[in-house]
């Protein structure tokens, strides 16, 4: 190793400078994260209504209970034709034209003048017919349509009571009330179908596929706030966070202006905007900045709703444009999805502990600053809510106590400062990745200093060219390259150090001499990986990545590549499990020997087991996987979260870090096969350290705490495991000696 350092000291010094640059970049991000320490809760009004229906109290009582807990904001979704039909006293019926025209006599069910206007205009199956009864309903619906739809996209016909001439197939109400009939012009992209609809034969075989239109986006388009609901919330002194559902193709400046008029009519200037549907209001009209000006003039924070797999955000039209235009005056929003609502009395808990754990992780680990809260449901009943207020009170009180350890409090949600990586710093980070890449082959190939420097110069030219030509892609490539390169360098270090240990210590050295050396090698290897983690995180340490408007790409490849490199390293240092190999360079005969190796059956079995373990390890990576974590492990994780500032990674402190110590032990004992096996498992831990910091949304202090806990626990577990392996090895030697003696008799 000394020779390696001496030969490459110039490049190693340059690499150290690049790491220092990464620390400077990381320091700016640290400051931004340190000031982002307040979260807020917004109640979902519609589900609060459903909760109230199943309890002995009305919705006003329930809202008041949450208000008394300090939760003062309520998300109120504007009404649409769908909500008016399904959950309001107003008499409204909306039907896709595809359904209407299936009745050959449909014209007789509507006023002649209305039908004639439709015929003159022309219609298709993507349109919608609406029937409204009652003065209040007519006023609400027609004002919403006239204010938010293009004048050329609808027909309205009103009929004063008594209304007798026609017998509608879909009567909205009695005939002694005024009625209105509306035709809404739809497009093919507005149509909504049921998935996988088909006719079946009596033999349960598919007969024909059906593509019946069951609804339209026009039926979900927001029309306005319901006055009674607004009054209920405002009488309690609570703040309304209006939610408007906007859809592409029906979301121009006219729509946005009418939405804002509706807000102003009730004196609502929202603190946050949590967009619904497909877009932020007004973002069909690229030439009109009305919506953006409204957000900026009123200092409104826009919510980025996290997806239900807890990765990235739901990217509605206009979200990213607004984020950039408002200097990232946005916050991440965690919606309590239905599968989380059901986690009451889950994993053996008695109450809402697992829901609390979910909220805790969202706030602490993923930069979530608004919880869009929906009431808890029973885990064995999809429709029954938990109606015990003490459950909610206890959950939020416990959550706030746990968040105190992170200096996070509840109140007006804080906004992340806009932090960007300076251009020259980005170049330095890319050069660091390039230099590290040049140092890798020098760990296992006989490269002279001159050729290493020439290769480094060529790498620098390529890096600089990429920095100029593709700056956006450059940051991702630099981050990915650093994650691979430094994990490989750390693996090379501990394998070099393990082999040197075998040359310094005798094969029968006492465990007391091996363990301190193994612990030191583990600590240095983890520090090298941590330096790589800084180089990995630094290029992406900007606000857009912290808010998951962009994410690290290539996680699985970054985990696999160092494992493959370790195999090459081992072949260079040990050949085919040679006990007394002196050279540390890869030779052609090593490769030929490996290709011609006759593998024993027991090795094949062991490799198959290792392969299955590797597949399980990779398959569990990320949220979108079918390989689930066991209940026992989840409970253990939750307990660690409660005890420690950050939960250490199980694979690090229970497997990978102890295996690095075992690899050193096996090297000293001249057990090259076990050095290879334990070393391969240990390399997983070094990639895991870098992987921890690939999650840019996670605050840095958690990554440092997690790695520190893993290292400390890994040292303890590693010492225990090494002691156990030493005992087994001694028993094996005794058994083998007795077997040989018995064979000689």
Give the residues covered by each predicted segment.
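Charged, low-complexity intrinsically disordered segments
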Residues: 29-42, 485-489
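Alpha-helical transmembrane segments of integral membrane proteins
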Residues: 2-28, 427, 431-745
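Soluble extramembrane regions of membrane proteins in the secretory/endomembrane system
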Residues: 35-423
